[in-house]
């Protein structure tokens, strides 16, 4: 599993997501890779994943298929529910 947040260093909601992303990485350990990409540093990846606003979180299953997407601040409980619905528990 891979969770990527596309954001930016001056984006306030992106900054608010950082502790949640860190908690998710700790909670899922080796079952999921949680990463933060700044769109200014990774514009090609942001375009490839059709990122239109920051932050955008994209979740991929182990086969690389996109299984969830959210734009904006994502409350931890809602984030966990979406991950569980996608199959990551």
Name the predicted role of every residue range.
Residues 1-9:
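Short active-site neighborhood of thiol/selenol oxidoreductases, capturing the structured segment around
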Residues 6, 25, 30-43:
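Thiol-based oxidoreductase modules, predominantly thioredoxin-like and allied folds used
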Residues 8-12, 40-44, 65, 73-76:
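Solvent-exposed loop/turn segments at secondary-structure junctions
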Residues 11-14, 57:
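The canonical Cys-X-X-Cys-His
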Residues 15-28:
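Typically the conserved alpha-helix immediately C-terminal to a functionally engaged Cys/Sec
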Residues 49-58:
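Structural micro-motif
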Residues 61-89:
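Non-catalytic, surface beta->alpha helical segment in thiol-disulfide oxidoreductase systems
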